Amino acid sequence: MMKRITRFSFLLVLMCLLAACGGRSFITDAAYRRRVEQDFSRRKAMLPQGDLFAVFDMDLPAYEREALEFLYAYMPLADIADYPGEFHLMNIRASRKAAEEMPWGKTIPEDIFRHFVLPVRVNNEQLDSARVVFYEELKNRVKSLSLYDAILEVNHWCHEKAVYTPSDSRTSSPLATVRTAYGRCGEESTLLVAALRSVGIPARQVYTPRWAHTDDNHAWVEAWADGRWYFLGACEPEPVLNLGWFNAPASRGMLMHTKVFGRYEGAEEVMSVTPNYTEINVVENYVPTAKATVTVEDEHTVARKQTDEKGKVFLTAGKGDMLVWVSKDGKFGYAKLPFGKESELTVKIDKVAGEAHTVDFDIVPPPESADLPEVISEQRAENDRRMAREDSIRNAYVSTFMTDETAREFAKRYKLDEELASRLLVASRGNHWVISDFMARLRSEKSKRGGFDLLQQISAKDLRDVRKEVLIDHMLSPMCKDNSLFSKYVRNPRVSNEMLTPYKTFFKDVVSKADAEAYEAEPMKLVAWVAEHIRIEKECNLGGAPITPEGVWKARVADAHSRDIFFVSMARSMAIPARIDEVTGKVQLMTANGAVDVNFDQVQPESQMLQKGRLVAGYRSVASLDDPKYYSHFTLSKLTSQGRLQLLSYDEGDADMGGGTTWAGLLKNGTALDAGSYVLVTGTRLAGGGVLPRIVFFSIVPGQTTEIELVMRERKDEVQVIGSFNSESLFTPRSGDGGTDKRSLLQACGRGYFVVGILDLNQEPTNHALCDIAAFKDKLEKWGRPMVLLFPDEAKAAKFAPASFPGLPSTICYGIDTDGIAEQIVNNMKLKHKEALPIFIIADTFNRVVFVSQGYTIGLGEQLMKTVENL
């Protein structure tokens, strides 16, 4: 089991690693080194306060000084302000140690090592000592392997530690993911990249901003071996590289991005260069591509590029349709570009905000073109055996978490609310020792009420990685004048997507009592102080986590988002109720009369009350969709004065890469919006992956209600016979689902239509499919036709727990595909990948197939019902 390691519990390791290391140069390219030195000097001059560069006062060998300068020149400001220089020096020495001790260390080119091994940061996670911890766990497992096989082995190790589960958008640190034993795809891929880099293997996180064929996105990993990049699904080990459940969806992708630390001079197409990273497009590793000369920005912006002086820019993308959005000086224009069919597109900038109009168009994604590497049966069997053992290792660790029974026993012992304590302790998973220790300190009835209120204010993910000193700090929050605002807007430590810190004690120590009292009496004085003393550098923290409030205070420099978190944190520390609005991102002071917007550029109280109007949208229900979902079916964006779309966020609950509210919850009865111009985008996803979008431009007028229609476009002729399937095919019912003797689908289902699904076990695509089906439980039960869900073998069927997917229709029966139903579907429907699961069909007992889906598909339940209701 992973040892518990707090943020700086690596002091002993640090002392060892800080021993002098001899020193060749870290950067041997003289021209590149000069560029780094220039960028480092600029960065140092930009940050004169806070003694942030004290580590350079040490007597360091050339290699370490150059490596530190490289990191400090380009790392996000959060990594400079929130972590001591010794932390970064420790990781430099750990990286060098891995390069010296691993057999492939000397084969890694200098530039590949510099950009894809040395940096600790992968995305926007909190940094921790994972590099040191993981190396000690992994070194003996991989040191005798080839680089190719070591990549596979590290992924098996990651599977021992974590599996996929959706969660909110804040990215857990690698050690927190291990402690929790699960994570969303962005956290799994962060874990794998961190683990690979810990043993000196170059790795990078790759993501598609938006799948072209389905309403979701994904992140995975590329690792470098022997001169080329391979891809793999994080914590989802396969027998070979370049194989994952997402092969097929990736082959339909439009763009694949990765952010490379620092100034990168590789061969890939550069999307953008920032002071912190170089964003590159690696789509050519996955799909046939085409180039076009465009400026691109869409409703889920997949790319943003700047034109040259002639108004032109090129982009490489998969061969599908993309909406091109061009803006300049407040005007904008847009058009559809079919990549591969047209190489140039001229977009006329002839529209301005405030013009009401509606436009419909069709989007077709790239065709599937995945090239799967061969896997022989022996390889698959061995991989399955290993995965089963890894599941048992991880489950043994998970068994140490508090259960409902043990949590209730704990609650009884300390005279706590059993129901509430159990829910919170079980949700905290591997962090239960922190939450239970905090609860045990709650002795009086008042402290129990306050402590449990605090634990309910923070997010589910916070429960899994919050530190005890943070909870204690915020329990000591000062009372505000209005008790109704205290719990949510003063004591609550969570402001936005930052890592929680004990900032209230910090501000109590650094802000004088007189100043604190003055700010509480007149909060606009605090607004003025922040506006005057915190300098905004828009690009200082790109690619990083938000700077902590303590880090902003120390540096007196921040990006706007970190400044906003800083202000709200400082306000709450002085009993001033404040928040960042989750929808608009605005900073607001909270009063008994409502929210007052904060404008750091114009600090006048009367200017803060922006006029609002109201938006109401009617909706005429279409088949299978009573209540459209935000993000999946529609979005709202504000049209800015620059002619760009600013997406409004309406997030709800834990959902990978964002899950939102619905039409009924948001627009049926209306919602308040600032006055201005807006865009409503709706999109109907077709079974084949295409989209039927509609864009509605409208305005919100102060004090008035704007009424529009939310229309989900339909295509009545979509359902047709697309293949054949033998309804006499046999399967073996799972014990308890109709006996264990083989039955035909006709026997099991009777005459008429039925659904057949071939499932994998504990894989993200299957889990998504089952959750999507559960969401349509009532409609599928009302339809009344059987759904036969089969597993490839008895072992997987035995391990499947339907209780893990509450709400599945009662019309489901489970079984084992003992007679090759999956193979028949693949062959008859001419599917390209015999092993890609899940597979779903709707067929009838006349052997006609009217629907097929393979692999990763968001909204499967909806697609099934759309087909059913059009039969």
Residue ranges, per PLM feature:
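Short, acidic Ser/Thr/Gly-rich low-complexity loop/linker segments typical of extracellular
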Residues: 298-317, 337, 642-667
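Short, ordered, surface-exposed loop/turn motifs in non-cytosolic proteins
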Residues: 276-277, 284-302, 319-321, 522, ...
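Thiol-/selenol-based redox modules, centered on thioredoxin-like
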Residues: 836-871
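Short, internal strand/loop/helix patches
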Residues: 802-837
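Hydrophobic/aromatic-rich core segments of domains that either
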Residues: 26, 140-156, 165-175, 180-276, ...
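Structured interaction patches on ligand/partner-binding surfaces of diverse proteins
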Residues: 330-354, 685-713
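Short active-site neighborhood of thiol/selenol oxidoreductases, capturing the structured segment around
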Residues: 745-773, 786-790
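Secondary-structure boundary elements
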Residues: 28-183, 215-216, 390-555, 602
